[in-house]
Amino acid sequence: MIAKTVSERGLLPLIDFAYQGFGHGLSEDAESIKTILRHNDEAIICNSFSKNFGLYGERVGAVSFVAGNSDAATAVQSQLKKLVRCNYSNPPRHGGSIVATILGCSELTQKWESELANMRNRIKALREQFVTTMKNTGKGHDFTFLLNQSGMFSFSGLNKMQVDQLKADHGIYIVGSGRINVAGMQESKMEKFCSAIATVLEG
């Protein structure tokens, strides 16, 4: 277990928590953090509201430090204040105010959670459609392993050469690691997308 190993080695966990709600649910996605904190007294958590609130242009997020004691909390707070002062001093408040307004109103919070659930279900459906369409290309390409993944992105297994070929021959852009933005898939273009991938896989 990672959380236990981190504790045994005296490491300070730094958790990138950018996509809460897109995996299995708001609470469910936070289980990994809860597990780490059950085994560790301290942790740094970096979370973002840019994705799950649709605020990409605002870059809204936070860094939280879970301290083992009050002295550690005070020391970290003083260092964070210095970093803030050196980097941006006073951040724009527009995006943060939007998040605060939504989370401060139960009706808006409920609506946001519902919309987030709809997006999560849409992503899941697109992933399933992709797997089915790849299977139905008639070329025996099995991508069922993607069904074990969740969230906005999936690692396709495509290598850098195949990714470059997708770009050059089919005008399809994905990152060099083969990571696909599932949320960016379109149901109406799935067959074309899968056909291009099948062609690339066959070399």
Language model feature labels by segment:
Residues 111-169:
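Conserved PLP-binding catalytic core of the aspartate aminotransferase-like
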Residues 132-136, 158-203:
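PLP-dependent enzyme catalytic core of the Aspartate aminotransferase-like
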Residues 1-26, 39:
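Catalytic PLP-binding core of fold-type I/II PLP enzymes
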Residues 13, 43, 173-174:
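Hydrophobic beta-strand scaffold residues
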Residues 77-96, 102-131:
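Structural signature of PLP-dependent enzymes
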Residues 21-30, 34, 82-89, 137:
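Alpha-helical subdomain
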